[in-house]
């Protein structure tokens, strides 16, 4: 890219997607480049011109904001023949394969090492639906290692939690469409505290990605009014397995102590 195109690209990335919703002239003026530079960059991105780029952005925004009713209508309009079990399973398997294919393994390993570092606390949070993923993660990670905490995505719970968050601690955040302001604000504040943010989001990318060190996008579309969390669950369980492998000596000791406590409390049904 030319210097002007790099300048334009930087402006678009900093102000995405709003930067691309105005006219060519407005974008050129805001980025301090010429109008032909805007058109040329759009063409280099594979579009016939700026209108094509704008159309793609608008389609993406519609997908980001799509609610349960419109999802159901869209899926039902093009549903193939066959039982819903088969159609749903096919979609989920496709999601898993696509998710695994696009995850950067080096980023995954780096995130696991951050979470395995005993010098760092680990926090997790999520939105209305994805908070369940954060809770699942925290429940297991508390066995794997100490100093793991669930952050509820409500503003009155943030200050005490952020007070305990040190520079270098890890925040695992989940945010899928329609993206929640509470999650974005919490991630932003944690990043300002110096936390290392690991974000799990969807193909349309949560705004919280701007504050994440590592970002993993998972496929979520299924023939339903709701997005699927199966691929998120896969990623969470794989992360936990990776951390467990890295900390196994201390984790095994913690598990042995926990099992002894469970046995003493007769927590599980089993031997009399």
Model-derived features: where do they sit?
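Exposed, interaction-prone assembly regions rather than primary DNA-binding/catalytic cores
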Residues: 103-117
